């Protein structure tokens, strides 16, 4: 039985969306137990009774505008912190939150702890693509500044996840750069390219450009945290803007536009589903001693359900235990 700690109070739509997503997951997966951390009265308004769910009451929560590290240190009873603490104490196997990203990263690093040998855990998400085959990308903002060694390690981490969780036998790893030639990029990218070219444990295919990553250029895309976060936000904004513009054109285009949309409704639905990030789950702070996963702040119940599904897969495949052994065979997860 997998025990998953869930911060019920984090995110724009908490606790309703969080709890409803938990209800769906409990109905679907019989091998999980959920610990919900937060305001018990508010949680019960949406919770379906189930013997595999428990509530740990707390009135304290971390707000979106709280300074991350300070919040973790001062708000010891916050729902997010208690969930991370449960993982540290082995009362839970993983923790999920849709709350303050920086605070969850801090809780992951300072409470759950990183695997020995991992210099900088990276924030990694499985992203949709136009081909229908998702790709993993990291770092998406856990670290604003990185060295070439960090990028080298991100490539190993991302390849490991793609292979062991997503089932890709030989993941193609690409380095995000401003051109595909090996001479492209600044000193960071050039140094990272040399390191990745010599790394025998991964299938490094060279540099990839931002315009290529949504078209299946690589299974794993490696970037420094600042660049990765900027690209992520650009992809999200472009997707939302495209759908909004398309909807506006249909609604304001008269009868012909509406008729065309009706005839294309199945195609349009398929397009929307292809670009739906929620079905891929949350962003994993990969390189820690247990799964710490961030849902999007605006997550609905569907996104929460898929994040729990993702964490369940991580626990089923024992990817963290395998990662510990890969980086330091003598260390045990604690």
Swiss-Prot record:
One GO CC annotation: cytoplasm
The answer to whether UniProt assigns keyword Transferase to this entry is yes
Q: Which reactions fall under this protein's catalytic activity?
A: a fatty acyl-[ACP] + phosphate = an acyl phosphate + holo-[ACP]
Q: Does the keyword NAD apply?
A: no
Gene Ontology molecular function terms on file: phosphate:acyl-[acyl carrier protein] acyltransferase activity
Q: Origin, by domain of life?
A: Bacteria
Which coarse location class applies to the principal site listed for this UniProt protein? Answer: cytoplasm
- Where in the cell does this protein reside? Cytoplasm
**UniProt keyword annotations, A-Z:** Cytoplasm, Lipid biosynthesis, Lipid metabolism, Phospholipid biosynthesis, Phospholipid metabolism, Transferase
Pathway given for this chain reads:
Lipid metabolism; phospholipid metabolism
One Pfam short name: FA_synthesis
Q: What is its EC number?
A: 2.3.1.274
Its GO biological process annotations read: fatty acid biosynthetic process; phospholipid biosynthetic process
Q: Which family does it belong to?
A: Belongs to the PlsX family.
What task does this protein carry out? Catalyzes the reversible formation of acyl-phosphate (acyl-PO(4)) from acyl-[acyl-carrier-protein] (acyl-ACP). This enzyme utilizes acyl-ACP as fatty acyl donor, but not acyl-CoA.
Subunit structure, per the record? Homodimer. Probably interacts with PlsY.
**NCBIfam families in the record, alphabetically?**
plsX (TIGR00182)
The protein's name in its UniProt record: Phosphate acyltransferase
Name of the gene encoding the protein in the UniProt record: plsX
């Amino acid at each position: 039985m997998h025990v998953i700690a869930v911060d019920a109070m984090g995110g724009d739509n908490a606790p309703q969306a969080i709890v409803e997503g938990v209800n769906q997951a409990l109905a679907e997966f019989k091998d999980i137990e959920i610990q919900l951390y937060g305001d018990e009265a508010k949680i019960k308004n949406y919770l379906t009774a189930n013997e595999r769910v428990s509530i740990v009451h707390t009135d304290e929560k971390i707000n979106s505008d709280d300074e991350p590290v300070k919040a973790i240190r001062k708000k010891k009873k916050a729902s997010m912190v208690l969930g991370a603490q449960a993982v540290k104490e082995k009362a839970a196997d993983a923790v999920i939150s849709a709350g303050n990203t920086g605070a969850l990263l801090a809780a992951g690093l300072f409470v759950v702890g990183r695997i020995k040998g991992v210099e900088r855990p990276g924030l990694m998400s499985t992203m949709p693509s136009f081909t229908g085959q998702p790709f993993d990308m990291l770092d998406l903002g856990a670290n604003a500044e990185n060295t070439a060694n960090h990028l080298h390690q991100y490539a190993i981490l991302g390849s490991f996840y793609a292979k062991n969780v997503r089932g890709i036998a030989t993941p193609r790893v690409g380095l995000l750069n401003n051109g595909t030639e090996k001479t492209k990029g600044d000193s960071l990218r050039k140094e990272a390219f040399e390191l990745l070219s010599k790394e025998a444990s991964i299938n490094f295919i060279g540099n990839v450009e931002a315009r290529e990553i949504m078209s299946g250029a690589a299974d794993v895309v490696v970037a420094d945290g600042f660049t990765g976060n900027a690209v992520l936000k650009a992809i999200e904004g472009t997707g939302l803007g495209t759908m909004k513009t398309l909807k506006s054109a249909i609604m304001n285009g008269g009868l012909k536009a509406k008729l065309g949309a009706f005839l294309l409704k199945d195609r349009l639905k398929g397009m929307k589903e292809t670009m739906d990030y929620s079905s891929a789950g949350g962003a994993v702070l990969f390189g820690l001693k247990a799964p710490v996963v961030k849902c999007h702040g605006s997550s609905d119940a569907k996104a929460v359900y898929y994040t729990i599904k993702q964490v369940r897969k991580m626990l089923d495949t024992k990817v963290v235990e395998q990662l510990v052994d890969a980086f330091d065979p003598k260390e045990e997860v604690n």
